[in-house]
Amino acid sequence: MKLTKWALPLFFLLFYLLPLDQRPLWSPDENRYAEISREMVSTGDWVVPHFLGLRYFEKPIAGYWFNSISQQLFGDTNFAVRFASAAATGLSALLIVWFALQLWQCRRKAFLAGLIYLSLLIVYGIGTYSVLDAMVTLWLNAAMVSFYLIRQEGPLRTRVAGYLLFGLACGMGFLTKGFIALAVPVIVIVPYVIYQRRLPELLRFGPLAMVSAALLAAPWAIAVHLREPDYWHYFFWVEHIQRFAADNAQHKAPFWYYLPMGLLGTLPWLGLLPGALRKGWQDRKISPETLYLLAWVVLPLLFFSVAKGKLLTYILPCFAPLAMLLAASAVDLLKEGKERAFRVNAWLNGLFGLICLAVLAVLALSPSHAVYGEEDHGALAVAMVIFAGWALLGFIQLKDVSRRWTLSALCPMVLAVGLPWALPQSLIDSKLPERFIEANQTVLMDSSSLLANDVGLASSLAWGTRRSEIQLFDSKGEVHYGLSYPDAKERYVTRSDFPAWLAEARKNGQVALLLKTDKDGSTGSLPPADETIVSHRLTLLVYHGAR
């Protein structure tokens, strides 16, 4: 696959932007961020984040701002919900290309670094998914690039400006996802400058970065404190200390969690990884930029591995430098006429596709592990075509691997194009309730009261009906903090209180209760509904208004 100056923009357009609107929003993450920004736009409150009309202090404000601006530009669409993540990923790729050009003065290495980055499975998955990680990764990439460039010798004015710019990037990262955006640069840069014996320079100019970051964040930080004095207490202790270090941390996982997840995320370039890391380690003493890139990959990975709370999205900042190391190693191997790593990579992609095909066959033929039901024959066929295509793209490289090895970039793109049509109905109802809500839009819009027993379902209801006043039934979930305020007490209904609450609510009109049930479909002891609509694990109970 020949690289041209239009390859990256075309790749980004075809595989990032065009598919954004094709699949429903995933619950709970995408619905949550869609609804928070929709409420921000509709209420005009750009200071205090609200979710389902409740105070929601899980993240700072900048990510919501970008999502809200996207909705103002593109409307209440799935494209708008995901656009900020995709745009941030595209900008990160451009930054990688530019930085690689500065380091190596080699256009091929630079463009390959951008292509590899955009086609990494983890980057594509997060970059087309509405979470804040792609945005904070952009700011971290900008911070790390700016610091490396200003560490070089230059005029005092240039260094001062560079450190101020570094601080602004860190400040934007902080406004997007909090203190973690300050921790990542520190854990990479401090050991690096100590190793380079340049700590005095960092101590001299570092305060400039701290000042610029503080000045950027201060207006909103002060404004939200004046509006909600408890914001910073909750955000710091609960969302940072408990999430990452406490014994009851969210998303607890073992130390080695990121090893298999990171390797999987490196597809479709996994075969090039050992050689790239080995070459980087060998060149660390003669190549300061290689040492910097290695530190940028390894130290954040170790930091997040030590933390008790783990999510795959946390390690996204490690993949920009990894893409650059992979690209540099690949070009050097081609110059030396070495094809082994490319053949291994082609075989790995081919085998990965075949393994996924085998797993699909087991899921289709084994009743005890059935995922695809009788109504899912079309979806199963699409899924098999996807992984057959992945395998084919791997194996066809073997005939002329030195010319065809970049075809690996297309492997995840087959998945990207076909995924919306490859999902079984059970998964759609469980994780993409948007379609069920759309199918029952008339009933829901005619209801004066809407309830849900799951926060993800509630956010889907709010987004689908453009109403934020969804009642939480029998489960507080992640909005338990917002529900603890006196002005939000009536937003939660217990199962024992529901009959009395329902009798009163029906005086004002129809009531709709959306439930996510267990596999047996049981809704528990509830008043009999006038209408019951069931699809797999989703049950909609409709109570007509009292006459």
UniProtKB/Swiss-Prot annotation:
It is a multi-pass membrane protein. Disulfide bonds: none annotated. Keywords: Cell inner membrane, Cell membrane, Glycosyltransferase, Lipid A biosynthesis, Lipid biosynthesis, Lipid metabolism, Lipopolysaccharide biosynthesis, Membrane, Transferase, Transmembrane, Transmembrane helix. The chain crosses the membrane at residues 1-21, 83-103, 111-131, 174-194, 205-225, 253-273, 286-306, 311-331, 346-366, 378-398, 408-428. Pathway: Lipopolysaccharide metabolism; 4-amino-4-deoxy-beta-L-arabinose-lipid A biosynthesis. It comes from the Bacteria. Coiled coil: none annotated. InterPro entries: ArnT_tfrase (IPR022839), Glyco_trans_39/83 (IPR003342), LipidA_mod_glycosyltrf_83 (IPR050297). One of its GO terms (biological process) is lipid A biosynthetic process. This is Undecaprenyl phosphate-alpha-4-amino-4-deoxy-L-arabinose arabinosyl transferase. It comes from Aeromonas salmonicida (strain A449).
